[in-house]
Amino acid sequence: EKVYTIANVRSRRFPLFDREMEIPTRCKEITKNITETEFEGLCETVAMDELILEKEPIDVVFKYIDLSDPALKREGIAQIKKDEDNEELKYALRSVLTNIPWVRYIFIVMPNDAVRFLKPQEEIAEKIKFIRDRDVLGFDSASSITFEFNFWKLKNFGVSDNFIYMNDDYFIGKPLKKSDFFYVDNGKVVPYMLYNDSVDYKRSAPIFEYLNINPLQLRMNSNEMNKQDQTKENAKAHTSYGFRFQRTSSMIFLYDYFKHDILAPGCRLDYFPHNALGENMRYLKEVYDIVRDNYKYANDTLMANSRKLRSLVHQTAYTFYVLNKYHNRINHLQDCYIDISELWLVVCNADLFCINEGGDKKYSQRMKENAKRKLETLFPIPTKYEL
């Protein structure tokens, strides 16, 4: 007889709270407030949900740039230290193919024509596909944030409705299942996520406590960003690298959120659902279609030409958390360039982690080399798609 957990049959709205509690289906605690018929119906629903999730295609999307490509220098793409290639993508791909092999396709979005350590596109298309920045944005860009505001366009390139988004320095540290990223609510596959905002603080507080996260620090970070916005003529969009900013950014996105009407200029999204979505929950509208007219790439910063875009920068894609069933071990380092020995002590116990080894002057060439050696230790086996 299949054993269901209390998480499967109790609260369909917030299943995270009880996910670790294994309780047999006959347990009186579960059936205390529901009839046997109702409980059997819930078990049938859970079985159906598991089948729905099993059949749901899930893709991985990487944003990548290799600034060693001479073509990009000719095209004038900004040369930024944090975008220097340390072959992180090679190990990120190995981590995905090893630890979440159930993904359907891996899409690499980039301004480059090819990835220098991978075989030609036609030889790897069974699993890995390339998308050019210019095909999504209308122009090539070194900016991940520009691309992230255009996630809704990925459906046009064959990306699954539900997908896992990663920069090229994100890694899957241990084997994970679909159910670690997504679950089914009312027959619809949705990602685990958590919304953080002062408007939603009271509802989020119990979840923060459960996950051992400091919401005050997060709110201070958010307030500081907004304060900076108010004092500058142009809004500065904070690119999230590592888990320093990843606390208030997204690694997992649901395409459906962004598939309807574009927001009118100046609109502010004051409410995001922070966990389950019911069928009657109206879809959130897609964020701005960012093109040259609204944004320009200048040095290491993406600047908005209009104050109208200010609130949008901090109210949309960058207000989610990533959660999975091992949430207490997700790596959220205060600094990505801390002592390398301390860094790897944390990373080796993480299910998801990020190594941004080129984003700051504090990160020396020696540390970059150490990081690469450690990645080679963690993910030593080449994939069949590598040259």
What does each model-found stretch correspond to?
Residues E1-I164, Y170-L387:
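ER/Golgi luminal nucleotide-sugar-dependent glycosyltransferases, focusing on the catalytic module
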